[in-house]
């Protein structure tokens, strides 16, 4: 009767049939609110997904609000990647939400359709953590080795909600290259300054003692390997 709700499975109340959630903030809801607001202000923003709209909080009522600015291509991540590249090529601002474990399904399209063409696609990678899915077919721990080796792709890893939103905003407004963003699993909020421009990646490290050690390690690696290290 409700295939969308029961697509993913999980603990539920046998009487009501409703899922049992821990409650509290989620990045799904945070990104949903951000994207719906962004869509109202900018008609060129298009959210794309492959049969898992709940990962960005786009339930049926929210999809109706988004209208044509939300596209579900069905269980076909390859199509989602190719469509995102096409939308970006023609001046749109595609936001493609995908589970980490499903990145493998469309590696060719990410590499060739998106990255070779340097299409400014924003790719939100969800459940990319040991804290996410536990079953062997959905482990979210292989996205980094897969994506970091693709030329022309910038892969960002925010540590809190404010960084996630800032990185997404920056990615949508830049037109130079595709950007993937590794959405955290547990909601945290920034305790310090949040950067707005990610064209040159730098680590923001606290406390100062750890910062000194990181700079020291970075300088040693630069000398030993002969290549610059982000610090």
At which residue positions do the language-model features occur?
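Short, flexible turn/loop "capping" segments at secondary-structure junctions
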Residues: 148, 224-225
């Amino acid at each position: 009767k409700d295939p969308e709700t029961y697509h993913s499975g999980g603990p539920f109340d046998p009487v009501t049939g409703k899922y049992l959630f821990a409650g509290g903030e989620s990045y799904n809801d945070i990104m949903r609110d951000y994207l719906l607001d962004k869509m109202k202000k900018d008609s060129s923003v298009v959210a794309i997904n492959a049969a898992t709209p709940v990962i960005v909080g786009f339930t049926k009522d929210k999809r109706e609000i988004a209208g044509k600015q939300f596209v579900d291509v069905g269980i076909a991540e390859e199509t989602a990647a190719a469509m995102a590249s096409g939308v970006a090529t023609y001046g749109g601002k595609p936001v493609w939400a995908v589970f980490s474990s499903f990145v493998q399904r469309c590696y060719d399209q990410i590499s060739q359709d998106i990255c070779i063409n340097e299409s400014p696609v924003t790719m939100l990678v969800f459940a990319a953590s040991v804290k996410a899915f536990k079953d062997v077919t959905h482990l979210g721990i292989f996205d980094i080795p897969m994506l970091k080796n693709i030329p022309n792709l910038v892969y960002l890893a925010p540590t809190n909600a404010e960084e996630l939103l800032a990185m997404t905003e920056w990615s949508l407004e830049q037109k130079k290259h595709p950007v993937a963003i590794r959405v955290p699993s547990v909601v945290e909020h920034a305790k310090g300054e949040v950067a707005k421009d990610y064209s040159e990646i730098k680590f923001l490290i606290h406390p100062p003692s750890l910062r000194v050690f990181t700079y020291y390690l970075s300088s040693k690696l630069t000398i030993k390997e002969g290549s610059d290290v982000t610090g």
